[in-house]
């Protein structure tokens, strides 16, 4: 993988994780983070530039979905779960 391509993948990975942290719901937040990490680990050894480009486009589309869902999540926030409340760690 070219250095610029690697940097682009890392930027996208960090952006996906950052946006996933915005979910107020513990369940959505942990699910999104787990799925992102699993997907990137699964595809880390791919060397085919066409396949990398295809996966990057898919990840960019997923980033847009996560951003949109994060905004909706904040508009209709619910009460925090017991495990999310201070003092319950």
UniProtKB/Swiss-Prot annotation:
Domain of life: Eukaryota
GO biological process terms held by the UniProt record: iron-sulfur cluster assembly
GO CC field: L-cysteine desulfurase complex; mitochondrion; nucleus
Keyword field contains Electron transport: no
InterPro entries, per the entry: Complex1_LYR_dom, Complex1_LYR_LYRM4, ISC_assembly_LYR
Coiled coil start-end: 44-71
Keywords noted in UniProt: Coiled coil, Mitochondrion, Nucleus
Pathway named in the protein's UniProt entry: Cofactor biosynthesis; iron-sulfur cluster biosynthesis
Cell location: Mitochondrion; Nucleus
A Pfam family matched in the record: Complex1_LYR
Statement: the UniProt record of this protein carries the keyword Nucleus: yes
Family to which the UniProt record says this protein belongs: Belongs to the complex I LYR family.
Protein function: Required for nuclear and mitochondrial iron-sulfur protein biosynthesis.
Name assigned to this protein: LYR motif-containing protein 4
Organism from which the protein derives: Taeniopygia guttata
Gene name of the record: LYRM4
